[in-house]
Amino acid sequence: MQAAALLSGARGVTCKFIRRLRAGMDGCGMKFLFKRSLITGFLIGLQFVLIVLGIFTLSNKIVYVYAGLQVISLITLILVINKKDNPSYKLSWIVVILLLPPVGVIIYMMWGNTVFTRSVKNRINKSFETFRFQLPQNEQSEAKLRAFSRTYARQSEYLKRSTGHSVYNDTETDYYSPAEAAFPHILAELKKATRFIFIEFFILAEGKMWDEIHAVLREKAAEGVEIKIISDDIGSGDRQQEGFVRRLAAENIEMVSYNRFRPALNTFMNYRDHRKIIVIDGVTAITGGSNIGDEYINVIDRHGYWKDTFLILRGGAAISFTEMFLSMWQSITHKTYKLEDFCYNPQEECTDTNGFVHPYADSPFDNVDTAKNIYLQIINSARDYLYITTPYLVVDDEMLGALCLAAQSGVKVKIVTPKNGDHWYVHMMTRSSYGPLMEAGVQIYEYTPGFMHSKLIVADDEVATVGTVNMDYRSFYLHHECGVWLCHNKTVLDVRGDIDQAVAVSERIRLEAWNKRPAGTKLLEACLKLFTPLM
């Protein structure tokens, strides 16, 4: 009861504190210095500490409380073991619960448990399922892919069964890296809009990049084009000035935030919308690793030169991204839409000489690890080479084993990560993964010009994926993600060439040097491994 009272009181105090602090800063002209996520994060941490202190205080005074906590820990372990989840992911949480009682249980309840978010999950899943059954199925494209390769047809079939999206061979693709190379083309595509523009990004930050996009959106809204925008509240909250959404609404531009970040402990705050999507008239779609922010197009320097990607699709596959956006929009706004009202016009089909394009989405709420599984399929089917770029390399035993097995089977495996990390603890965990991979024969490179933010995988000059998926626990298990699987497509060679160029300016990490890391670094890496489910 005391712990519950502490939590209730902390929530009330923090909400009042946020309102008063914001009002005070607005009144003294300091509202742009106000970092909502920083203050909110601090207050959430304060609530966490108060709960832990309350539990320890009670358990030290009352033996029954201590015994009860042990029973709760045991029950939690049983629930985790029997949960329908990836075994490696479950094992990581079991270690946390066993080594940090009773704090480990609290951490799991806040960041690993999904029972308390069931109503929210059901609402989002219902929205996603509603649109999934409205997606067109392309049996002709599927037959052509089966005739080309049974192996790659099985990968595409998996994506279809797990997401509802089909494969297309009527879609042109243009790959751009770095992201600033795509920016003029993105503006040009936005200017072509006559019906609607949908935009969904994890980070939508004010600055030069946004200003140029906004100028086009404002013009198009004045022409009557329907414009809807989704941004993630944690990703974007601190990078938009006060009244940002209100000013857009005055220009007939609708904007909503996914999963508002509030100053109270809750189990849903861990799930974020990490997708990057632009859809224009249902005919053109844009995705990739880049967000909307000046560092992504190297207008400002953050962690050195920023290496990122965009992929522009024109043709039938654009409807998949229309569906992804509308399903998310409907889950947030509770408004009902029909995909047919925004669908692609078949009369504008491209030729079928562009290879195969299969968009896919991944949700943390459907108990299907789509992004991770398609990565595993590409890794396991590679024959000659497998190249990967990722900003983070924090993988479970299943992914680690697949990469090692590929290298041990004679496949040339190269992985490029950043030389400069954006989060020291994740960067340290990334580097801690190098050893077992290099021992198996995987070549590890660090991108020396700056920060490698591209999320790419390519194999055998035949198959690749471009999208938003990092090789870490958060992307595989906790985020909404999206990507494009490509086969027998010119973009596959573009991706391979891009990674070759990145390798040429990267530093190869050698096992001998890695083994000579300071003892303090090794100890800190070992401690951080306890928290891999959060990274």
What are these regions (language model features)?
Residues A5-L7, T14-N373, Q377, S381, ...:
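N-terminal localization/anchoring segments of enzymes in phospholipid and broader phosphate metabolism
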Residues I388-T390, Y447, V466-G467:
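Thr-Gly-centered strand-to-loop micro-motif
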Residues Y392-V413, P418, H423-Y425:
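Helical hairpin unit composed of two closely spaced alpha helices linked by a short loop
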Residues Y385:
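Phosphate-/nucleic-acid-contacting segments
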Residues Q240, M399, Y425-M428, I457:
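Short, well-ordered secondary-structure micro-motifs
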